[in-house]
């Protein structure tokens, strides 16, 4: 009987050590992967419920966050959405993010290392946290022209400053409205995405950066 009890305690001890080792590994070595996991509900609400910074062209916000009355607190809104969709991409609680929303996510969400002191200042001042705005090098008039030239056609236009490499315009046609994927209603987002994805003209396909689809000219 004593031997059986000892074995039971030894087994329990081994299980305890294994659990503690696993928890320690997760806490100290696997934190980032858990934080970045799209199925992590806490990260999901923290990320999509943040007062995200604006995307700006010529001093005008083409993507911004406005207060909402649901669990996410803030709703992402795109102005002139189809004109700038190839640049902004979308920010969706269901499908993640694309375009500048993805490439500059840490800056827009306020989580980049360069914004550490800003976060500390906000903590001590009691002001609400907000991501940084990202100002694009795009010229709104050139962007308008690019979209007009592509009207009714499949294709893309990219205008680059040859001296600096700055993107002055980037358009892809046909385009889409990223607001339809930024809704906080998951079923609505899924329905809208499936409709866009099944469209034979592939509006979600960014022809400006998708590879060697078209010859330069």
Regions found by a protein language model. Name each.
Residues 1-156, 171-209:
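Extracytoplasmic/periplasmic proteins that interact with beta-lactams or build/remodel peptidoglycan
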Residues 156-162:
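Surface-exposed patches in mature extracellular/periplasmic domains of secreted proteins
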Residues 209-217:
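Active-site-proximal helix/loop microenvironment
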């Amino acid at each position: 009987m004593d031997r059986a009890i000892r074995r039971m305690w030894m087994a329990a001890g081994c299980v305890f050590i294994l659990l503690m080792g696993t928890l320690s590994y997760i806490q100290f070595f696997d934190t980032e992967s858990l934080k970045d996991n799209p199925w992590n509900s806490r990260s999901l609400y923290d990320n999509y419920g943040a007062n995200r910074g604006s995307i700006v062209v010529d001093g005008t916000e083409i993507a911004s966050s406005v207060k909402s009355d649901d669990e996410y607190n803030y709703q992402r809104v795109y102005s002139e959405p189809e004109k700038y969709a190839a640049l902004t991409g979308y920010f969706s609680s269901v499908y993640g993010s694309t375009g500048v929303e993805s490439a500059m996510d840490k800056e827009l969400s306020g989580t980049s290392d360069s914004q550490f002191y800003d976060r500390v200042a906000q903590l001590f001042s009691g002001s609400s946290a907000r991501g940084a705005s990202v100002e694009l090098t795009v010229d709104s008039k050139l962007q308008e022209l690019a979209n007009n030239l592509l009207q009714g056609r499949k294709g893309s236009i990219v205008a680059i400053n040859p001296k600096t490499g700055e993107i002055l315009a980037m358009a892809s046609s046909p385009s889409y409205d990223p607001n339809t994927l930024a809704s906080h209603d998951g079923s609505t987002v899924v329905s809208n995405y499936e409709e866009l994805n099944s469209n034979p003209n592939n509006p979600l396909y960014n022809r400006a950066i998708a590879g060697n689809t078209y010859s330069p000219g």
